[in-house]
Structure formats: structure tokens, C-alpha cells
Design a protein with these regions (language model features):
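Positively charged n-region of N-terminal signal peptides that target proteins for export
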Residues: 1-4
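Hydrophobic h-region of N-terminal signal peptides that target proteins for export
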Residues: 6-18
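Primary mode marks residue(s) on the alpha4-beta5-alpha5 output face of response regulator receiver
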Residues: 20-191
């Protein structure tokens, strides 16, 4: 019995080391699965420290979308990493949001986030702590597709109400307004 327990302990220890969420393998698998496989399997993958982990062949890029600093041991889960897959126009949008500048897109772009995100204010960009959120506007989303418009004004006739299950605008009235398109499982993290 003692040998069985020791063996089980060794197996458990080995499995802990093999699930290193900062590894290139984990990041490639996790980030590329933010989009359907026909996109993610052929996309370039950027690691948590900005390095290219895999060159792609389809013009799409997958990376973590969580704006918080990349943890030394990696993200705890795919959901926490908030992986996103986008094309070059989507990258322009991501960079502009991160730099606080106005996106300058040559056309509309789509982004996939099939692992969702860990929550933010639906009205105010950059508010990532629930206690600082506009009352009633905290949304922790499940799987979704996003439309990043070249001209955010084209979204003015869409609702900003995320509780209905229909496409809605996140960050309405700002340069970062985009259309959130919920897919199956979108509300799994709402409490």
C-alpha cells in the first residue's frame, strides 16, 4: 500500500510539472483555441511575453487578451488568459486600445474569444475591477465573436444591454465601441 501511495504521489507531481501554463505548448494550444480550429490551427501564436511561438499561414494571430501582466507561471486557465484571435486589422485595434489611441482601421475586423474574458465594465474601457465598474455594467463573458468596426458610429443603433443574448455594443460612444456577438455558453460566468 505504501508503494502504491508513493507511486501515486510521483505521478501527481509529474502531472503538475507537465501542466506548466507558461509553456509554449500550453500557450499555443490555449491561444489558438480562441477561434474555430479552421482559423486557430493555422494562425500565428504570440506568447505571453510578446514572442512568436508559432508562425502561421492564414494572416490571423492568436494571443492572450488579458491586459494584466503575464504571470511568471502562466495564466491559471484559458478563461483567465482571455485568448483572442484576430487578423491584422484586429491587431491595429488591440494595439490602439492598449496604447490609449484611436484605432485607425482600413476596414471592419472580427475577433474570436471562445474562452471569454474575466470581466470588465461594459461602458468604460480599461475598468477591470468589479468594484470600480459602473453599477450594473460588469460583464464576465463566455464564448463570443466581436466586430471591430472601422467607424464605431455604425453601431449606434445597437443596444448596449448585454443581458438579452443578442449582439450588443461594448464601450458605446467611444473610439473602442465594438459589437459583442454571444455564442453558446456566453452567460456561463454570470452570477
Amino acid at each position: 500500500m505504501k508503494k502504491v501511495l508513493i507511486a501515486m504521489g510521483l505521478i501527481f507531481s509529474i502531472s503538475l510539472f507537465s501542466s506548466d501554463n507558461s509553456s509554449a505548448d500550453w500557450q499555443i494550444k490555449t491561444y489558438s483555441s480562441a477561434a474555430p480550429s479552421f482559423i486557430g490551427d493555422f494562425a500565428t501564436v504570440i506568447g505571453g511575453k510578446g514572442e512568436t511561438l508559432r508562425e502561421g499561414s492564414n494572416g490571423w494571430t492568436c494571443q492572450h487578451g488579458n491586459p494584466r501582466p503575464f504571470p511568471e507561471t502562466g495564466w491559471k486557465s484559458a478563461h483567465e488568459a482571455m485568448p483572442v484571435c484576430h487578423d491584422d486589422e484586429g491587431m491595429k485595434w488591440m494595439m490602439a486600445l492598449g496604447e490609449g489611441t484611436k484605432p485607425n482601421l482600413s476596414r471592419d475586423s472580427f475577433m474570436w474569444m471562445l474562452h471569454g474574458d474575466v470581466g470588465e465594465d461594459n461602458l468604460v474601457p480599461g475598468v477591470l475591477d468589479k468594484k470600480d465598474t459602473t453599477p450594473g455594467q460588469w460583464i464576465e463573458s463566455g464564448p463570443h465573436l466581436m466586430l471591430m468596426p472601422k467607424d464605431p458610429k455604425t453601431l449606434e443603433n445597437f443596444t448596449a444591454d448585454f443581458s438579452k443574448g443578442e449582439p450588443y455594443v461594448m464601450f458605446p460612444g467611444t473610439d473602442y465601441a465594438h459589437l459583442m456577438i454571444p455564442v453558446e455558453g456566453y452567460y456561463q460566468y454570470q452570477k
